[in-house]
């Protein structure tokens, strides 16, 4: 587990420009007061972004080949079995329609972790 944590720490220092942008939008409870972590280890995996309270994993994907997609499916299955909900976005989705990405994250958070206080 220490190897995974060490690798996660390294990844936090080497974010892609897409990860940097999404982290800017999610960090420090800027996003609807939900707390997110970046490059968060869960088991033998490292999640791009995680809201632990809602058990939501947000993944950003670049160009992929078949082996990577198969790995991602297996990883998502394992995370689902552990109670995590995973949503994925392509890197270009963030640049092309940032608002839609944030809206989808918020809708998912509200579904998984509804606010204890109803909005007026």
Regions found by a protein language model. Name each.
Residues 38-40:
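Short acidic-hydrophobic surface loop/beta-edge motif
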Residues 1-34, 112-120:
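Solvent-exposed, charged helical/coil patches
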Residues 11-15, 43-109:
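Basic, amphipathic alpha-helical patches used to engage nucleic acids or provide basic targeting signals
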Residues 34-35, 84:
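A generic structural motif
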């Amino acid at each position: 587990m220490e190897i995974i944590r060490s690798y996660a720490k390294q990844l936090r220092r080497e974010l892609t420009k897409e990860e940097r942008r999404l982290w800017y939008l999610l960090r420090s409870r800027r996003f609807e007061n939900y707390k997110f972590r970046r490059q968060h280890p869960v088991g033998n995996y490292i999640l791009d972004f995680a809201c632990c309270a809602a058990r939501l994993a947000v993944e950003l994907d670049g160009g992929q080949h078949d082996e990577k997609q198969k790995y991602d499916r297996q990883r998502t299955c394992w995370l689902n079995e552990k109670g995590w909900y995973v949503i994925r976005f392509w890197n270009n989705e963030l640049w092309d329609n940032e608002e839609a990405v944030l809206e989808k994250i918020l809708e998912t958070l509200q579904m998984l972790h509804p606010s204890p206080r109803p909005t007026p």
